[in-house]
């Protein structure tokens, strides 16, 4: 049984249901979909809705959509990245992160004990070789987390493939919540390692989910939420199984550095410019008022905004004709 919906989620259910029904009716108007096509339509409509809704409410939005169309639950959970949740391992008393890659039914596998909580007798666990790599990777990224994040929670999960293995590196750091501020950073790095002669081919898909909120009586409320995904492929030399941990660590470190710089220089930089422009308009209006008052005192008529725009347009046309 799904958990009961909150009043906000129930309101969202109605909105999502109307949007999904609209998409379905639109496709039905143009085509005569088969049952398979109908499932694809609903899945695409759900993804389209999630892209348009506030990223900080992804969990509630997923809950609302899956309560309408339960058949989409598995596909949506495996396709949509959402903020990571923390659980404590009952055996080792250490925190670990939950995701679709360490889930089996309603149970989650701890990377520290390799056991499921709630207990699961026939849960899927990695082979002995891959489990050893998983343990080594958790130790390595635990150090990485302390050095780069100075706290937070991290977890690494590996699983077997026919021609190699795959894994996911999870990192979560939250801002210490104050009275009017909050924030979270979630990193999800999924990779595949294909074994070759003295080499390994790595495919890495990295996603960062960021939420920052601040409220101030003087400046008002600010909410920056979103996610960004980047991919890369590379061939690296492998001398032993330990080389995989070093290679994956280097790839994740480089990718996180690039994504941090991109967020800071492009996204935060653009947001800063927009906020600066909004804050400068009241000052500009105040300056214009003072200038007009000065013109009145000197007996000069101020140049209208229309004349200024015309003069700018004429100057632009002249520069293009040169």
From Swiss-Prot:
Entry GO terms, CC: actin body; actin cortical patch; cellular bud neck contractile ring; cellular bud tip; F-actin capping protein complex; incipient cellular bud site; mating projection tip; medial cortex
Q: What is its main location?
A: cytoplasm
User: One Pfam family this chain carries?
Assistant: F_actin_cap_B
Looking at the UniProt entry, the stretches that span the membrane are none
- Which GO MF terms does the UniProt record name? actin filament binding
The family database entries (InterPro entries) matched by this protein are listed as: CapZ_alpha/beta, CapZ_alpha/beta_2, CAPZB, CAPZB_N, F-actin_capping_bsu_CS
For this UniProt record, give its keywords in alphabetical order, as a comma-separated list: Actin capping, Actin-binding, Cytoplasm, Cytoskeleton
Q: Which SUPFAM superfamilies match?
A: Subunits of heterodimeric actin filament capping protein Capz
Does the entry feature the keyword Electron transport, yes or no?
no
Compartments, as annotated in UniProt: Cytoplasm, Cytoskeleton, Actin patch; Cytoplasm, Cytoskeleton
**Alphabetically, which GO biological process terms does the record hold?**
actin cortical patch organization; barbed-end actin filament capping; cell morphogenesis; filamentous growth; mating projection actin fusion focus assembly; mitotic actomyosin contractile ring assembly; mitotic actomyosin contractile ring contraction
* Subunit (UniProt): Component of the F-actin capping complex, composed of a heterodimer of an alpha and a beta subunit.
What does the UniProt record say this protein does?
A: F-actin-capping proteins bind in a Ca(2+)-independent manner to the fast growing ends of actin filaments (barbed end) thereby blocking the exchange of subunits at these ends. Unlike other capping proteins (such as gelsolin and severin), these proteins do not sever actin filaments.
Instruction: Report the family membership.
Output: Belongs to the F-actin-capping protein beta subunit family.
Full protein name: F-actin-capping protein subunit beta
Which gene is transcribed and translated to give this protein?
Answer: cap2
């Amino acid at each position: 049984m799904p958990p009961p919906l909150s009043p906000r989620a129930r309101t969202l259910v109605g909105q999502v249901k109307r949007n999904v029904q609209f998409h379905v009716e639109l496709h039905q108007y143009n085509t005569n979909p088969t049952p398979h096509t109908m499932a694809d339509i609903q899945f695409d409509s759900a993804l389209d809705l999630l892209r348009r809704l506030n990223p900080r409410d992804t969990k509630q939005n997923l809950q609302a959509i899956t309560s309408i169309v339960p058949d989409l639950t598995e596909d949506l959970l495996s396709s949509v990245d959402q903020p990571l949740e923390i659980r404590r391992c009952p055996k080792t008393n250490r925190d670990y992160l939950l995701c679709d890659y360490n889930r089996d039914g309603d149970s989650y596998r701890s990377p520290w004990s390799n056991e499921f909580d709630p207990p699961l007798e026939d849960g899927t666990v990695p082979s002995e070789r891959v489990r050893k790599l998983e343990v080594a990777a958790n130790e390595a990224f635990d150090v990485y987390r302390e050095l780069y994040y100075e706290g937070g929670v991290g977890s690494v999960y590996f699983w077997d493939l026919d021609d190699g293995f795959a894994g996911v590196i999870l990192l979560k750091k939250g801002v210490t919540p104050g009275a009017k501020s909050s924030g979270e950073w979630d990193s999800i790095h999924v990779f595949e390692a294909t074994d070759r002669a003295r080499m390994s081919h790595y495919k890495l898909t990295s996603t960062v989910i960021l939420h920052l909120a601040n409220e101030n009586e003087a400046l008002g409320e600010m909410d920056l939420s979103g996610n960004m995904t980047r991919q890369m492929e590379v061939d690296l030399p492998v001398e032993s199984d330990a080389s995989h941990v070093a290679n994956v660590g280097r790839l994740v470190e480089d990718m996180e550095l690039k994504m941090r710089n991109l967020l800071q220089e492009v996204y935060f930089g653009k947001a800063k410019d927009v906020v600066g422009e909004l804050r400068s308009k009241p000052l500009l209006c105040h300056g214009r008022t003072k200038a007009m008052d000065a013109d009145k005192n000197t007996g000069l008529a101020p140049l209208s905004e229309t004349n200024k725009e015309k003069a700018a347009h004429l100057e632009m046309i002249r520069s293009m004709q040169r």
